[in-house]
Structures are given as structure tokens and as C-alpha cells.
Amino acid sequence: MAALSSRILIVDDDVETCRLIAELVAAPGRELHQCQTAAKAIELAQKDTFDLVISDINLNGPESGLDVLKAFKQAYPGGEVVLISGFGTLDTAVQAVRAGAFDYISKPFNIAEVRATVGRALARDSKGGTTAEQVSGVPPEGIIGRTAGMLAVYKQIAYAVDSMAPVLIQGESGTGKELVARAIHVHGARAARPFVVVNCGAITETLLESELFGHVRGAFTGAIADRKGVFEQAHSGTVFLDEIGDMPPAMQVKLLRVLQDGEVRPVGGNRTIHTDARVVAATNVDLDRSVADQRFRQDLYYRLSVIVIHLPALRDRREDIPLLIEQFVRNASARTGRHVTISPDATAALMSYRWPGNVRELENTIERLVVFSRGRVELADLPATVLAAPSLEERMFQGLPSLDELERRYLVHVLEALGGNRSRAAEVLGIDRRTLYRMAERLGIALKDDAERAT
């Protein structure tokens, strides 16, 4: 087993971070080495053999962790590399995985994640696992976020780009599902080919069939010429099927056939056309429930959900809101020629709002604020819906009973448990009977006298 004789090199320009990682991954049979520069790590990789390299991406000096990865994979293709970064973004996650990294971990560390990742990397090294081929860096797509939920999304995108399998993106309206679909396309081998979008819930069944599969001249009224469907248009590219959960049942059958056979038949046509388009679908509905309710085909669901990416709602990643605000203000300011800032109080209120429309609603709100701003957006400038929302602190205690209500419930519970015996109740509560009477009167509780209890 590799774990019995594993040599691990830890690379970080911070000595304390190196020591911390070493403590986390130390185990019997593991030989740990540390260095603080990419140059030293590359030198060691060329002179010695390691089963695993754990390196920060951002290192002091001209070379980065990606350079360490490249040198190590050239010197020892059978080894594994885990990259670490304190500035988790989609670009770094994709570059790391596609450059051949086994995995990508963000700071601050999750102890269990670090240990599990190292264990899996050593296990795969012992089996001679393969890695992704090296490619160049990639441009940003406008996906913003550093919370754990978004870092998980970045990892899923990074794994999806090198696969030709269908992808299902789940998330509420406005969470950025099309952005994720485009990111998968532009990072993959099909980036130079078409990316075609179809909203399955926005057009009728007849038009949807023609949109997807095309039609021949005379197939229906108004079909005055042959027309290619999106699967033919996107040959060797990507078809993005938005709102797939709203697709009519009859169309689900035909889509399933395309996924199974790689062929489409235009409406009114008598021949099939081969298509090599990759399918990325998105939905804001619970497809598991739709399958259970027989509104969505189970076999199609299985075909589409080979890779599943779940986008968190904005309310579940509030820490990303300031980053989003900053980007949206920058974009809107560039379009309008205005220099606008958002006050801390306004930012806090924007973070407190639940954003039912998610990122799209936030972006539209910021756009309006910039357009009508006189230079600085204050709390009073925010929409009434945002101002009316409870603060984070208020929402934390929302729905909790008042102290009087808790006191009342407790007194009723004690009295019922003791059969209404006032003396025993006072004793249990640690008060005298007079205080018990005053408490009951204040809380609106009628105390039965001994005669009433006897009956």
C-alpha cells in the first residue's frame, strides 16, 4: 500500500502553514518534507521522487504552485499534486484541475477535507490513476463568490469541463445557471464550437420540437424552407436546455432518443441526422419530485444527471453579497459613466434582504441605484422592500416566543404535572405562594382552589 511508504512534499511560503499542513497529514509510514519557494520545490522534484506534492498556488517569487505542478508532473507523471489557495475562484480551480492537479483545497482549511483529500490522492497514486491533460489558463466568466458553497461549484465545473457527459444544473431562478453552463463550455474542448441556448418553458410544444430538431420545408404552415435545429447547429458544441423541468412529456421522449442514439429527425423529415452536441440542462424545479409525480421521465432524468451541479441561493451565501455589489457597481458605473459608492449601512441592509430573485435581482437593484444615485448610495436610497426586511439579528430571533410566553408555558406545565397543587407548584418553582398568585395573575392563568381540585 502507498500509505506505508509515502513521501510527501509540502510547499508554502509561510513556515507556520507548512507546519500546520504537516501536522494534519502526518501518519505512520508518511515521510514529510517542506520548502517555502517554488524554485526549491522544482529543484527537489527534479532530484528526488515524491508520491504527493501539496502546494500553495500563490507563492512568493516569479513562479507559482502551477509551475511546481508542471515540473512535478514532468519529473514524475505517476505522482499526485494537491493545490491550495486562499483566494478561491473558478479560474484557479479550473486551472488546477485541468493542469493535472488531483484536487484543489481552499483556505481556511477544513481538517477533515485536507486529510480525506490526501488519503484519496495517495490511494490513486498507488493505483496509477490518470490525470487531466495540461492546457492554458482560461478567462473569467463573471461567476463571483468565495463561500464554501461556491467553491464547491467551482470544483464541480472543473471536473465537468473535461467530460463529455450530460450536466444538470439545479438552482432557483436568478442563481446564475446559464453562467455556469457557459463556463463549462468555454473551459472545455468544445469552446471554439457553438453554444446554443433553448428555453424549454418559453415556447409551445410544436415550436420547441422545430427549435430542437429543425424542420423540412412544408412540414407545417409557415415552414417555407428547411431549417436546422439547435442540435444540428451545435454539432460538436454545446446545447443548453434551460427550464428542462417544463419540457412537455412528448418532447421528453424525443430528447431521450437524442441522448441515447446521437441522432435527430427534423419535423416532417424522413431521415435522421447525426449530432455530437453535448447537453447541459438546467432547472429551478425539484426534478426528483417531478419524477415521483410522473411529470418528468425517470429515464431522461438519469440520462441528464450524470453530473449534477447545485447552485446555492443568494440568501445561503450572504458573505458573497459585498463582492457581488462591488462588481455590479463597477459594471453599472462603466456603462453609465458615473462613479458611485455604496455606504456601509446600505451594504448591511442589502446583506439582510432575502433576495427571492437571487443574483439577478441584486444586479438589477444595483443597476437602478447607480442610475439614480448622486454619487453615494445611502440607506434611505434603497428600495422599500429592502428597507422593510428584518435585519440579520432580528431574523435570528424571529418566531421565538417572548419571555412572558415561555414563563406562562412553564407555569402551566408545572401546574398540570402537579394536578394544580399550588403549594407543591410554588415549592418546585422555588417561590412562595403569594409570588405564585401574582405570577399567575400577570400571565392570565386561573388557579384552582383546593375545593375545585377535589371535584
Predicted regions and their residues:
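Conserved post-Walker A coupling segment in P-loop NTPases
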Residues: 109, 156-221, 232-248, 313-318
